[in-house]
C-alpha cells in the first residue's frame, strides 16, 4: 500500500469516511458490471436549485475520495424522474393555466410552456444538464421516461409482478386505511388520455406481464407493465431503480429518511443489493424554518454567485452535511473568509494527512488553486466599502494598492473579484441597515485617545501595533467586557454591531483617512452640544 493510500484510509474527513464504507461493502471485489455506480436524483417539476448543486457537489467529493482508495472505475449518473405525473403547477412558470390542463400527465408529455423544447420535462432536463455542466460535474444523464420506454427496467418490472404480494405486504402497513384499499405499486399510463393513473389494480399476471384495472366507465383494461405502459409508485420505483441499475452509492435529503428502509427492502426483494447511503440534513432559513421554494425563503445559486465565488458555496455544502444548517444571505461572507483561510492553510501545510482533512482538498478534488489576498478578507472589504461607499471597485483598489503595492487586479484576480462582490453585497444588504451610535461623553474621551494615537503613528506602522494600541485604550476606558468596547466603536465608526480587527482595517483604510473618520464623529458630538 502507498503512503498516499495510508493517509487517505485513515482520514476522518467525511468524504473519505463515506468512501471507506463503500470499499468495505465491496468485500475486496469489483462489482460485476466492472465499475462503481454513484447516483443522484432530480425531480424536474421545477428548476435546479441550490440543493441540486449541494447533492451533486457532495456526491462527487465522495466519488473522488473513493478513487484515492481504489482503482475500481467509477461512474456518476444523474437520474431525472421525468415520467412522474404532474401533481402541482409551479408558480414561477409561464402559461400556468395551459400547464394546469395536463395534470397527471408525465412531465415529458406536457407541452413546454417556455416554448423551447419538445416538452416541459425536456425543458427542465435541459436546464439541469446546463446547470451541472456549468459547474464542471462529470456525469451520465438518465431519463426515467427513456429508461421505461426503452425497456431498461422491463426485467425488474416483471420481477415486481412476481414479488407483488411481498411488496404489498411491505407497503400497505405504511398507509391509512382508505389508501390501503386503492394502493398498487403500478400506475398504468392511460392509452386514451396519457395520464399516469393512480387506480386500484384488479388483477396482475406475472406470466404474461400485465396488470388489469377499471377505467372510469367500468371497463376492465389490461396493459403490459413493460415498455413504458406502466410507471411504478415513487417508493417502489426508488428501490427498483437501485436493483436495475446496480447503484452502489446514493445520498438523499432527510425528507427521504423515513422511506429509506422501504427503498432498501424493495431492492432486496427484487434480488438487488441496496447501495451505501448517506442522508443529509435539509437547509433552514434565518428563523430556523425549513426552506421552501414556494415560500420564497431560500437562496438561489444565482443569488449566491452574485455575491461570492462558487468555492464558498461548495465549502458551505462540504461542512457538516448531516447537520441542519441555516442558509441565508448572512452566511455568505463567513464562508468566503473561511474558504480563504482553508486555502492558505492548505498551501502552507506539508503533511498530506492534514491536507486530506482540509475542505479545499475535497472542494477542488485535490487540485487546489493557490489564491493570494494579502491578508485582506471579504469582511474587511465590506467594512472598507462601508466607510468609503464606492461606486466601483477602482475606489477600493486605491486603498488596497496603498496597503499592499504588490497587489493589482491582474496579479490578484481573486481579490479583484472579491472587491466586486463586496460592493454588491454592501449595496444590497448592509447600506440600508446601517445604524450609527451617537457618541457619548465617555465615547468622546475614547475617540480623542484614538485620534491622539493615530497622530503618533504613520502608515508604516504594522497592523498588530495599531490593534494593540486600540486594545490598550479600551482597557483604560473602564469597560467590564472589551467586547462591548469594540461593539461601540463599530457602531460609532461603521454603523454596525460587528466589524473587523481594527488594526488591520486602519492599515487598509489608511491612518490619515481613519483620522478624518474619527474626527468626523467628534464633530458630531460637538454639534450635539
From Swiss-Prot:
Where is this protein localized, as stated in its record?
Answer: Cytoplasm
Q: List where the motif 'HIGH' region lies.
A: 44-52
* Record has Iron as a keyword: no
Q: Which GO terms describe its cellular component?
A: cytoplasm
Which residues make up the binding site for ATP? Answer: 293
The reply to whether Protein biosynthesis figures as a keyword in the UniProt entry is yes
Assigned protein family: Belongs to the class-I aminoacyl-tRNA synthetase family.
Q: Could you tell me what this protein is called?
A: Lysine--tRNA ligase
Query: What gene makes this protein?
Result: lysS
